[in-house]
Amino acid sequence: VETDEIIAQLDTFQARLFIRRNGQVEPADPNTLANNLLLIRGLLIQLVDKVAESESIYRKTKAARFDSFLTAHKPGEKAISKSAAMDKLDMEDDLIDMKIGSERVKNYMKYVDGLCTSIQSVLKVQSSSEKSQY
């Protein structure tokens, strides 16, 4: 499953967490919340794996590119310095895009995790108020 597909599934399950009632948006019933939270948490685990995989690819690509910068000089020419190679790496468009993509997914995961935590708090309040009614 690709990252974009996981995010699309997350969006679907997030939409089920809330309902419109009388022009207001409020949490869905406790069973719907609990079921969708489980699905969301499962998808978050998949996203963690995807982020780890993309960061590994980024690091390997960056290291290989760095090595190629250091070794890519003609005989008799002075080799590029490590700091110049690092500066050159910082300007590589594909590496920049890889890093930004990974950061976006990590930030999205933080948002979804915060949303789940908030919904879990709502569930606790709802279940404790139901228990106090008995």
Residue map of PLM features:
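Extended, amphipathic alpha-helical coiled-coil scaffold segments used for oligomerization/tethering
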Residues: 58-97
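Coiled-coil heptad-register positions
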Residues: 21, 55, 62, 69, ...
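Generic L/I/V-rich hydrophobic alpha-helical segments across diverse proteins
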Residues: 3, 10, 37-40, 112, ...
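Short, well-structured hydrophobic secondary-structure segments
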Residues: 34-67
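Short, charge-rich amphipathic alpha-helices with coiled-coil/heptad character
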Residues: 10-45
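Amphipathic alpha-helical coiled-coil segments
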Residues: 43-54, 90-113
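Short amphipathic alpha-helical segments that mediate assembly, nucleic-acid/protein binding
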Residues: 3-6, 30, 66, 82
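Terminal, low-complexity, charged helical segments
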Residues: 1-4, 25, 134
